[in-house]
């Protein structure tokens, strides 16, 4: 799952996640057998972390979102991306959510099915006529609705949906009836975990799943995330809301590309791009260079301190091989420590996102983060390799 990213600088996000949750997330992403990886709790943690690995990679090239939303679990990634909660607390919250949902699925077994080629109204009618515990769980796109409930009720609603014109019914390989009242048993544990999170006002608009509205008040998000467990994901309406905010380019970060396809159906006039592996960054940069993504992606992320993961320390790495020469203006005042002299800075220089920290050969090295230089990791005149750490920063904007 995560192997394409293992040699990318953003892979360090995985170590931060492992430290935050006390689990070997790298093993989960690289070596876990499919049976283990697809367990609800593991799948949610792996997806969350990999999505933020991709977000980190996107922000390393100088882009940050102008608005955010996430489908189901993705809402947690969206809140981290918008600066509304710290990465470490988000990771711990995802673990609590996954465990709670897995237990709820055991207590109240259920399943889900995608109905293709049917309207929202007909999908709702199929659920009502089934006369069992079945509800619409996802309003994904025009002509695509997901229903969830007990196995018998979902089967009955699926047959009624076929009678109402559904072209196809696709049973989903899930371990519970997510986003329905059958998940009610998960809410107490999630509420408790939400109480431990220090939510902040989002730095950019975040549109919620449960009502497809922007919520800027941080005190509202615990209730919204709790309600999401038992209420439908209104994804089609969410894309419409983002379009109403002026978005014409949508970027999906993380494994797969399902949301990209859904977005194209919800907003056919918009540009939708998926970044799932490092090679996809080139297509993203091509889109930005063509001026197509300026509405939803800020180029150069000063307003977000260069990143949204709020990790305490980061490194700037060499983009290529060659001789490293540091930027002379970054000498640490009062320490006698020259730039590029490996060692600690007791009175560190401050750098902003995009600042020049040196050159490798003729290639400029600019920091994708804002923070304080606390240690030079390569000395002036040293021959460095691509990906070799050059300078160690304590990032600004961290939230502990």
Q: What is the role of each PLM region?
A:
Residues 19-23, 33, 82-231:
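Alpha/beta catalytic cores of group-transfer enzymes, especially the acyltransferase/condensing modules
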Residues 271-295:
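Short, flexible loop segments at boundaries between secondary-structure elements
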Residues 356, 362, 389, 395-396:
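Short, surface-exposed secondary-structure boundary micro-motifs
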Residues 1-123, 168, 172, 249-279:
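FabD-like malonyl-/acyl-CoA
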Residues 372-390:
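Short, compact, well-ordered microdomains
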Residues 59, 162, 240-246:
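Non-catalytic positions within long, well-ordered alpha-helices that form the structural scaffold/packing
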Residues 299-370, 374:
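Acidic, low-complexity mobile loops and tails
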């Amino acid at each position: 799952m995560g192997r394409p990213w293992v040699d990318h600088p953003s892979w360090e996000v995985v170590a931060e996640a492992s430290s935050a949750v006390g689990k070997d997330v790298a093993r989960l992403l690289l070596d876990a057998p499919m049976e283990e990886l697809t367990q609800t709790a593991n799948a949610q943690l792996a997806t969350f972390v990999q999505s933020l690995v991709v977000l980190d990679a996107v922000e390393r090239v100088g882009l940050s979102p102008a608005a955010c939303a996430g489908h189901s679990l993705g809402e947690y990634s969206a809140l981290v991306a918008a600066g509304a909660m710290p990465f470490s607390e988000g990771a711990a919250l995802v673990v609590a959510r996954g465990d709670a949902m897995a237990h709820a699925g055991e207590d109240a077994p259920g399943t889900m099915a995608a109905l293709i080629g049917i309207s929202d109204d007909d999908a709702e009618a199929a659920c009502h006529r089934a006369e069992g515990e079945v509800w619409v769980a996802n309003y994904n796109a025009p002509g695509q609705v997901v229903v969830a409930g007990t196995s018998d009720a979902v089967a009955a609603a699926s047959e009624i949906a076929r009678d109402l014109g559904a072209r196809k019914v696709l049973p989903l390989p899930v371990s519970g009836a997510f986003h329905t009242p059958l998940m009610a048993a998960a809410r107490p544990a999630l509420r408790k975990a939400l109480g431990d999170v220090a939510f902040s006002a989002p730095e950019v608009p975040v549109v919620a799943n449960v009502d497809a509205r922007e919520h800027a008040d941080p005190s509202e998000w615990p209730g919204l995330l709790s309600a999401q467990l038992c209420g439908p994901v209104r994804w089609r309406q969410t894309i419409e809301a983002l379009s109403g905010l002026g978005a014409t380019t949508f970027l999906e970060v993380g494994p797969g590309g399902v949301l990209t396809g859904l977005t194209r159906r919800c907003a056919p006039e918009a540009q939708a791009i998926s970044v799932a592996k490092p090679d996809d960054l080139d297509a993203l940069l091509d889109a930005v260079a063509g001026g197509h993504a300026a509405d939803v992606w800020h180029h150069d992320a000063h307003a977000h301190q260069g990143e949204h993961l709020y990790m305490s320390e980061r490194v700037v790495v060499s983009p290529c091989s060659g001789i490293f020469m540091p930027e002379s203006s970054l000498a640490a005042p009062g320490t006698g420590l020259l730039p590029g002299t490996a060692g600690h800075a007791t009175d560190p220089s401050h750098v902003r996102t995009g600042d020049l920290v040196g050159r490798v050969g003729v290639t400029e090295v600019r920091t994708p983060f804002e923070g304080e230089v606390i240690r030079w990791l390569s000395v002036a005149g040293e021959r460095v390799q691509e990906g070799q750490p050059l300078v160690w920063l304590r990032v600004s904007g961290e939230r502990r």
